[in-house]
Amino acid sequence: ADLDKGIITRESAQELLDCIWVKLNDLNKVRDAASAEGFAGYSLFQNLIVGGQDKDGNDVTNDLSVMCILASMHVHLPMPSLSIRVWNGSPHELLIKAAELTRTGIGLPAYYNDEVIIPALLNRGLTLADAREYNIIGCVEPQKAGKTDGWHDAAFFNMCRPLELVFSNGMDKGELVGIQTGDVTKMTTFEEFYDAYKKQMEYCISLLVNADNAIDVAHAERVPLPFESCMVDDCISRGLSVQEGGAIYNFTGPQGFGIANMADSLYAIRKLVYEDKKVSMEEYKEALAWNYDKGLDEQSVKDISEMILKGMQDGGMNVTEDTAKAVLTTVMRLKPTEEQLRRFTEIHHMIDEVPKYGNAIDDVDYFARDVAYTYTRPMQKYHNPRGGQYQAGLYPVSANVPLGGQTGATPDGRYAHTPVAAASSVAKLDHFIVSNGTLFNQKFHPSALAGREGLEKFVSLIQTFFDQKGMHMQFNVVDRETLLDAQKHPEKYSHL
């Protein structure tokens, strides 16, 4: 209307929008060291979404949708985290314009699949009208704005840790932290081994829920949010804050990660130990303890030393500073024999030769899907103090790096205390059950999106993945030379 009356021009409206984009980048969130590792980058999570549907199922794309994309192109700044909802009614040119933004290398927008997210939210009790009007809160988590208290980053759950507990019979650094599922070297079938993993997983999930629910109660008692509660239905009419369960929809959403490592680990164990019998479980366990052919790294030396010292203290011995130094020195000198080292190298090579997840191999991809169920299905039976349900997500942000640093070697050949694989969101996973969101980042060379033909192929890639019921995609478009030059001259690459 203002355009028709001459009150504002399209160009000046675009400039105002660009200014809002700049203003959003005035903010910064200073994180502690642990949070900075888990949420690496300029992650303020001010999410703005365009496209999608209204409550009646009509496409809501309009001129402002394109102007928002253009604003991100113009300012080349990380905020807002622009997202695009994609469904079978999305205008093709909206997707082309979004692809043009992706081509700039800014890492935006994120693409979300209505055909998966809406049914996933319906499965969590949202009405159809509310599910159709979902938006993204934070990183990749869908919810109905103004009606939800989702606590979408309630925890990060490393799926490799229960596997470590299977090999240690529930022990960690000399303490029983899991359940005792038996001596792994005496498990005669793969089914027995996999069942032990599932039991450790369920127990770890119960610990997570207990911790999260305790924190939830503490939030309600110690850090009430009266202003936010005024903005969320039905807090006022119920006379309850969001922390007390005043919102219409209440959830707790812990994120699981490490699916790729787990799929490869389970397949390798089944193949090498139980089917081909090329490696005994005793050898596998020993290889993991020694970190394959790498030997004990600094973190392993520290962990073993602490375990020995704790055992000495528990036994009534007086542990002095000199004692601690002597133990540390002794552990540092520990090395596998030449024969052990040769065998560990052979085992690691055999693991490398075993087929891996992500290569359209059904036997391996089955484990990825099943491990996801092992995490998500037990999770959804729990409830929080606000009367809401637990709902799982499958993504690590960047927590796979610090939490991988706390994880020993894994049976897929990953060395101790290195990052756990982040890739989890592929089409063969059941995204309908992961209503707290998934994350699937990919990297492309700029030449892949060159010209109109490159954009068309890129849009087809997204549509194909979404036709296979994937939930989310996001892309980095940059070449190696640019990244190397950015390390030398960061002032030239403020947009990266």
Give the label of every model feature segment.
Residues 1-496:
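Conserved catalytic cores of very large enzyme subunits
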